[in-house]
Amino acid sequence: MSFMSEAFKYLAASIAAGLAALAAALGNGKVISKTLEGMARQPESADNLRATMFIGVGLIEAVPILAIVVAFLILFL
């Protein structure tokens, strides 16, 4: 392979992983802030909100994990 195609592979992998991490960080921040807002408004529903928040954060975190898998596929295939 040429030098440029190898360089573009590394660039594409880093952009994919970086943007996914940025989007997940923003999404997690939004979910957690809104959950804390809801807990402050209705403290009696804190347990339900916390459980729902953990499920949401887990689903959001699945996106960067998949992006890292795609980045590795770009690099090694």
From Swiss-Prot:
Chief place where the protein resides: membrane
Membrane topology classification: Multi-pass membrane protein
Reversibly protonated during proton transport, annotated site positions: 61
Keywords: ATP synthesis, Cell membrane, CF(0), Hydrogen ion transport, Ion transport, Lipid-binding, Membrane, Transmembrane, Transmembrane helix, Transport
Record SUPFAM superfamilies: F1F0 ATP synthase subunit C
GO CC field: plasma membrane; proton-transporting ATP synthase complex; proton-transporting two-sector ATPase complex, proton-transporting domain
One Pfam short name: ATP-synt_C
Domain of life of the organism encoding this protein: Bacteria
Localisation: Cell membrane
UniProt-recorded Gene Ontology molecular function terms: lipid binding; proton-transporting ATP synthase activity, rotational mechanism
TM annotation in the entry: 7-27, 57-77
NCBIfam families reported for this sequence: ATP_synt_c, PRK06876.1
The family this protein is said to belong to: Belongs to the ATPase C chain family.
Subunit (UniProt): F-type ATPases have 2 components, F(1) - the catalytic core - and F(0) - the membrane proton channel. F(1) has five subunits: alpha(3), beta(3), gamma(1), delta(1), epsilon(1). F(0) has three main subunits: a(1), b(2) and c(10-14). The alpha and beta chains form an alternating ring which encloses part of the gamma chain. F(1) is attached to F(0) by a central stalk formed by the gamma and epsilon chains, while a peripheral stalk is formed by the delta and b chains.
Function: F(1)F(0) ATP synthase produces ATP from ADP in the presence of a proton or sodium gradient. F-type ATPases consist of two structural domains, F(1) containing the extramembraneous catalytic core and F(0) containing the membrane proton channel, linked together by a central stalk and a peripheral stalk. During catalysis, ATP synthesis in the catalytic domain of F(1) is coupled via a rotary mechanism of the central stalk subunits to proton translocation.
Protein name (record): ATP synthase subunit c
